[in-house]
Every structure is written in structure tokens, then in C-alpha cells.
Amino acid sequence: DPGSKMQQVAEADHFRLVFFGRPSIGGRYSALSNFGMVPAAAMGLDTKKFLDRSQEMARACGPAVAVEENPGAMLGIILGTAARSGRDKVTIITSPDISDLGAWLEQLLAESTGKVGKGIIPVDREEVGAPEVYGDDRVFAYVHTAHGIDVKQDAKLTALEQAGHAVLRISMGDIYDLGAEFFRWEIATAVAGSIIGINAFNQPDVEASKIATRNLTTAYEKTGSLPAETPVVVDGGIKLFTDEKNAAELALAAGGDKSFAGYLKAHLGRIHVGDYFALLAFIQMDDAHQEILQRIRHAVRDKKHVATCLGFGPRFLHSTGQAYKGGPNSGVFLQVTCDDAVDLAVPGQKYTFGVVKAAQARGDFQVLAERGRRALRVHLHDVDAGLATLAAAVQKVLA
């Protein structure tokens, strides 16, 4: 951004060229600006071809185009009216060659629409299941390239259609149509937001977690430690934390069972029809951790018939984090944190990167609790052993 610290560093170090973004463009809408296109050019993408395709979609979505012929407006009308009728969980399915599109759509939809108690909850990387594991609160958005279709995945989506679920199919010629899809979905999101009754271009609840995090790191700078907290359950290498209101509700639901499994069962028992379950993992995002967390989310979906989300912190704070705190109070959250096997100092500060991560997790949880969300934090001493224990416990309490 013009005038930022990064510009000052670039000029001081005599960078060959500085590309400026437009401060008026929100980050989630900036894929076709310098923020998206400069890296694309650097990696060898044919940017002219890419932007030519994007321009075709921009013209098709222009204000002079009739609504019924406007692909962005029509998609937005579908998403907005579906959300108002209760189908507010947009499940994103892509062909394997464009799988990362889901993460971009997840941020666009969640950060744009999830506010003032309303919103569309995007669901990314949830495997397609049998029709009977879903409730009636879903819209399935299937985006694929012409030559990237997964036959088995396509057959599962056909089964969902035949069972009466809402399935949108969007076919791209090839990956150079991604820019066109960026534009289509940006227009659609704005239109859907208007129908829902929110401003799609602000993110009022993102800053709340930042403030809570800064308060915690400031406390660390003064005292050399984060404020003390008391677990509600200690069970081997696992500790459970939550706020007073959630603790009281969980203790009542658990009855005399004060174990990890007892509280976990009580927490998952708070998931009702129309809710969604979100795993908020402040741990390393690697294949092994993703695999076990995916197993957990699918176990919850298949048993509870609710939408499930999986986000790794702190990155989800700037995407789905907005909807979790500002959107409808229909989420049940399980935050996962762990001790750091290795930590690094932050230059010029007393705190370490591990402390910053812990403060981000605690700060976000604090705001979830302040917003009256159903939330429980699982802290693992050993992340790998702890995840295995957590997965086994989830399977057991859902049985």
C-alpha cells in the first residue's frame, strides 16, 4: 500500500520497482489487482490471456446487462435468496485441478457476508458424502474445468441432485477462466449481501480479535508471561479451557462426568439441526494434521448431519473468522492449541512467535465467548499424540 512500511523498506533497499495496490480495494476483492496479478506475472502466467478472459466476464456482468443474462447477478440472487430461506451453508466443491479456489471463495463469502448476525457460511474441502448425511441448509457450488472432472465426485453430486439437494454447476474451459470466476463471484457476493441485508465491503469483527491479541502481548511485554488461565479439565496431556458461561453449561450437560470425554460429549451435544461445527486449529498445517482433523469433521458431519468447517490459525482469522464472530450464532467451535516443540524469538520484543500464536488463539476465543458462541478449547501437550487421542474421543462420544 502507498505510504506503508513495506514501501519505505523497498525504497531504502533500492528495489528495482515497487507496485502499489489500491487502498480502496478490500483484500478479498483484490485478486485481479496488482496484489494478485504481479505474483501471477512473476510466476510466468500469460496475464494478457488471463485478463482478457476476466474482461469478458466483467462485460457480461455490466450494469447495462439484463439481470437474467448477468452471470454474477444471477449467482448472487440464487445465493442470497437461498440463504434467506435457510440454505445458508454454501458447500464449495471443485475439480482437483482448481482445488485451491475453495480457500479464496471461503474468504470472499465469509468475510463479506458474515456480520450483524447474518451471513453465508462457506464450507471448503469437505468431502462429498451420501445424500442422507446432509440437512436441508445446504447449497452445493460445483466449479470445475472442462477436462478436470473427477468422475466419482461428479457421480456423488448427481446423487445429491437426484435426492433434492440444491447443486449449482459452473463449468470453466480451463484454468485461464479463473479470473472470470473471480469477477463473477465478487459480483455475486455483493448481490447476495444486498439480498441478505448486509454491507459486503466491510469486516467489523476482524479487528476485535486483533485488539484482544494486542492486549495479551502487551501484558506479556510487561510481566514476561501471558495472563494466567485455569483449565476446566486436565486429563493426561490434554487440558480444556473455556469461559464461565460455557463452563457452566458444559458442567451441567456433563453431569457427574468431569473427564475430557465427558466434556467433549457435552460440547458436541450442543450441535443442533441447522448449526455448523468448526475446528479452529492453531497448529502446524501439514498433511498429517489435516488428515486427522478431516476425519474428525467428517465424523461429526455424518453423525450430526450438519455442515463442518476446518480452519488453521491464524490464517482463518482474516477469512471465516469474521463470519464466526459476526455472523449467525449457529456455530459450535472446537479450538485446538498445542505446546510448541520449537520456538523463535521476535526481534526487538520480549515475546516469541509461539507467544504471539498463543495470544492470537486466546484472543480469538475470548471474542467468540464475548459474542455468546458455543466454544471449547482443547490444548495438547504433544500435538501428534493429542490429536490421535482427540480423534478417538470424538469417534467414541459420537457412537
Set out the residue ranges of the language-model regions.
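Short conserved micro-motifs at the rims of enzyme active sites and ligand-binding pockets
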Residues: 103-104, 135, 151-155, 179-181, ...
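Active-site phosphate/pyrophosphate-binding segments
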Residues: 1-140, 146-151, 184-298, 302
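C-terminal amphipathic alpha-helical interaction region
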Residues: 202, 207, 224-228, 266-279, ...
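Phosphate/diphosphate-binding loops
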Residues: 146-165, 169-171, 200
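Glycine-rich, charge-decorated loop segments at or immediately adjacent to ligand/cofactor-binding or catalytic sites
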Residues: 3-15, 176-183, 311, 317-324, ...
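Ligand-binding clefts of soluble mixed alpha/beta catalytic domains
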Residues: 165, 175, 190, 194-200, ...
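A generic structural motif
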Residues: 20-26, 112-127, 166-176, 303-315, ...
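Extended C-terminal subregions enriched in glycine
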Residues: 149, 276-308, 312-318, 325, ...
